[in-house]
């Protein structure tokens, strides 16, 4: 469950102060599908960066599964990202020198998952996105849509 209460984000420079989010209150239940939509510059990316713990709000509260995220320290935020969050960025951020298999496997290596278990998980994910047959290819050998699925 994701919940925000009066979430605000203010960007300040010497010349101008910009309110990217203005007291956003949001409640998303587990399994619920939500689309964040709006014109360019309305705060969509800012909201998603806060929900993904890449940025901290200027004010307001953010709860994830009942825990207050905006009060967590860096180690707690790292654990939250590692165990609960996933990102698909507009740019794919795949490592060109690694195969499709290795790109998918890399986060599991950092999580300390054993080789046999990693192999099973990677193969299952690649099969799910219909790319198991591309496991030994490199990102530049894939279409944009295929790269997006790998990411």
Set out the residue ranges of the language-model regions.
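ABC family nucleotide-binding domain
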Residues: 1-151
């Amino acid at each position: 469950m994701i919940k925000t209460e009066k979430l605000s984000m203010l960007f300040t420079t010497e010349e101008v102060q910009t309110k990217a989010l203005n007291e956003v209150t949001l409640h998303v239940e587990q399994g619920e599908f939500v689309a964040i939509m709006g014109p360019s510059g309305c705060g969509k990316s800012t909201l998603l960066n806060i929900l993904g713990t890449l940025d901290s709000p200027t004010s307001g509260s953010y709860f994830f599964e009942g825990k207050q995220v905006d009060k967590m320290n860096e180690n707690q935020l790292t654990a939250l990202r590692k165990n609960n969050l996933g990102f698909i960025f507009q740019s794919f951020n795949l490592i060109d020198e690694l195969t499709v298999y290795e790109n998918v496997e890399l986060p599991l290596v950092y999580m300390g998952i054993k080789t046999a278990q990693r192999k099973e998980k990677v193969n299952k994910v690649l099969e799910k996105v219909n790319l198991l047959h591309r496991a030994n290819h490199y990102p530049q050998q894939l279409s944009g849509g295929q790269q997006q699925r790998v990411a």
